[in-house]
């Protein structure tokens, strides 16, 4: 008789594979983490800010979000109107699990509407499961509207986040369209994983597995996601083969 639970050693990984109802995890939206702001944002080119910005950029590249937060707080304490610093700071708060603080940081910005501001607000809203508002913010950046001239990076970031929001709000057709566009532009393993996750939610386990197979060894969450898809399809022997060497035989049989 098939067991209806999963061993504790796999519970966190299987959460990433959608089995526990997780809404958004960092690896789900990690693709569009970036270190360079859009050219539309007002720059503060003083020597001190240039040095502080360099520290924040370097910290982002290594996911050292606490350094970004520390430096960003110092910067806006001295210059509350530094929009660029607020964007870095908001992104760091969302990445470290405090999206409400990210929105507070951005709420002090007025009279400015840029792609990056919309992207960071949407990122925080997605983390708060406010998918409808996130889609509204991102729609002008993903449907061809001329809100402003977008960089390729901003357009991909907007599409990536919008796809997450559509998927989590069960608008799978819209999510599929964006994921397919993204993968046609650039075959990115994180985007492929996110697409697989969306397909699983949609009930398309076979299609989800097809997206996961090329990235099993590239994205840590891909293997547990593949296990979830295989179990959904009743392919227990394939689960055993996939987990051989990862778990002992007894644990594998518990899982199955």
Q: Where are each of the predicted segments found?
A:
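Short coil turns that delineate tetratricopeptide repeat
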Residues: 46, 80, 112-114, 146, ...
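Register position in tetratricopeptide repeats
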Residues: 61, 95-96, 127-128, 164, ...
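Terminal, low-structured helical/coil segments at or just beyond the last alpha-helical repeat
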Residues: 31, 217, 222-256
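TPR alpha-solenoid repeat register
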Residues: 85, 117, 151, 158, ...
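N-terminal leader/linker segments that initiate helical-solenoid repeat arrays
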Residues: 19-84, 95, 104
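Canonical tetratricopeptide repeat
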Residues: 88, 120, 154, 160-161, ...
């Amino acid at each position: 008789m098939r067991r209806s639970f999963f061993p504790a050693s796999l519970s966190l990984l299987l959460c990433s594979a959608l089995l526990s109802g997780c809404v958004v995890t960092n690896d789900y939206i990690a693709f569009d983490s970036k270190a360079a702001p859009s050219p539309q944002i007002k720059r503060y080119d003083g020597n001190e800010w240039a040095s502080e910005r360099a520290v924040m950029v370097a910290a982002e590249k290594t996911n050292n979000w606490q350094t970004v937060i520390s430096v960003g707080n110092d910067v806006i304490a001295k210059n509350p109107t530094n929009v660029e610093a607020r964007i870095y700071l908001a992104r760091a708060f969302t990445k470290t699990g405090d999206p409400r603080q990210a929105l507070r940081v951005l709420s002090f910005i007025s009279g400015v509407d840029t792609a990056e501001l919309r992207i960071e607000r949407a990122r925080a809203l997605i983390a708060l499961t406010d998918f409808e508002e996130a889609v509204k913010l991102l729609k002008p950046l993903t449907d061809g509207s001329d809100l402003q001239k977008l960089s390729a990076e901003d357009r991909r970031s907007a599409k990536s986040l919008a796809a997450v929001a559509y998927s989590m709000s069960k608008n799978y057709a819209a999510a599929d369209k964006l994921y397919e566009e993204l993968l046609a532009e650039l075959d990115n393993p994180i985007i492929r994983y996110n697409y697989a996750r969306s397909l699983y939610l949609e009930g398309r386990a076979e299609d989800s597995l097809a997206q996961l197979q090329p990235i099993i060894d590239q994205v840590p969450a891909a293997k547990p996601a593949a296990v979830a898809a295989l179990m959904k399809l009743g392919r227990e022997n394939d689960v055993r083969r996939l987990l051989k060497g990862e778990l002992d035989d007894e644990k594998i049989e518990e899982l199955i």
